[in-house]
Structures are given as C-alpha cells and as structure tokens.
Amino acid sequence: LQYDTSDLIMLQNILLQKVNAAKLSVIRGHEVYPSNGDLFKRAGNSYDMAERKYPFLRYKNPSVKSSFYGWFGDYLGFTGYYNPFTGEAQVNTTVPKFLQPYIATHEMAHQLGYAKENEANFVGYLAAVNSNDSLFHYSAYFDLFIYANREVYYFDSVASKKALEQLNPEVKNDIVELKQFDLDHQSFFEPWITWLYGNFLKLNQQPQGIHSYNEVVGMLVAYYKKYGKI
C-alpha cells in the first residue's frame, strides 16, 4: 500500500479527533470497564453489529477467554494471542483496561481467518468502531492513533509532537499509564522474544516481521481515500 507523509499526517489528525471524541463519550457516559466475561460478550456483540454492514465479519461460535499466562505475558510483551490448537482467542486481561476491547476484537479477527497481523488489526478496528460501545471505539482509536503517530514521527517529528500536544488530557493520562506499565514490566527476555516472534511472522508470509502490526496504517489510508471516513 502506497502513501506519503501528507497521507500519514492526514490520517493522524483524523485519528486525533476520533480518539479525543471517543474519550469524551466515555467520560460523559460515565462508562465503567466491564468484567472479563462481559468484555468478551460485548466484543462478540461488536462483530454482530459490524456484520450488518460487512457480511464477511460474521462471527460464529464465540470462544474468547482470559489468557492463563497474562502476568507472564506482561514481561514478554504479549497482549493476546490466537491458539490454533483450540481455536480460542486469548486476551491478556492484566494489561491496562483501555487496551483490552481492541485486543479482543483483534484476536477474534484471527479466529475468522485473518492470519496476518495488519489484517487482524484492520478487521478488529472495523468491528470495534461499528459497535455502539464507546469503550470499544476508544480502545481502537487509541491504539490506531499510536500507530499513526509513531509512523508520522519517522518523517515529521514536529507534526507528531504537535498531535500529541492536542490530545485530550485524559488520553494523555492513558498514554502515561501505558508507558509506566511497559516500564514496570521490562525484562531481559522481551527483546529476544520480540526478535523470535518477528522472525516467526516473517516465516509466515509477513515480511515486515514485528512491524506488520503497523501496516494497518496503510490500510486505513486506503480505506479513507475510498470511503472518506475512518
């Protein structure tokens, strides 16, 4: 997917507006993050709603659960995974709550057959933002803004920093919380696990390795150019 710096900045600024608006909706609605069981049920509901618009997102036989290795995964950098032997979507429910809705829809995308990480990110986004759940909207837009902002930084650090400054204060607080969480769970093993996983992705037709996740940015640019919305 081809895009230039102006496309990246355009996408970043749209996501900036989306994540700020979603956070305001969460605050004004006094939304409270649900229990794990309710979270997974609501993730399934998000696919049910998205299916009305995108029939290919039909999600049958829900099977999502908390990862038994959540605490261990914190130190290895895992937020969730798809178990190909059981067909279950596993969500690390020890990570910050605001990440978990999008993690759930991402892992459920793998269950639908979207094996590549950029595809699972995009399908998870479609499910999350087409739901009527502001917690899912915020979770997806938060993660996607971070992806886009990081990409912009490589080409225009001034534009990247300017966007960060324009975030809602509560969104900034969540970024601080996420950074602190990552700092608290640094380990000697994480760089090695990241390297191994990156090579695993390359062996499975994802040549960008660990950076495959970021390729959702190009898909979002293409989607916006075709449909005029994110």
Model regions: which residues?
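Alpha-helical transmembrane signal-anchor/signal-peptide segments
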Residues: 1-8
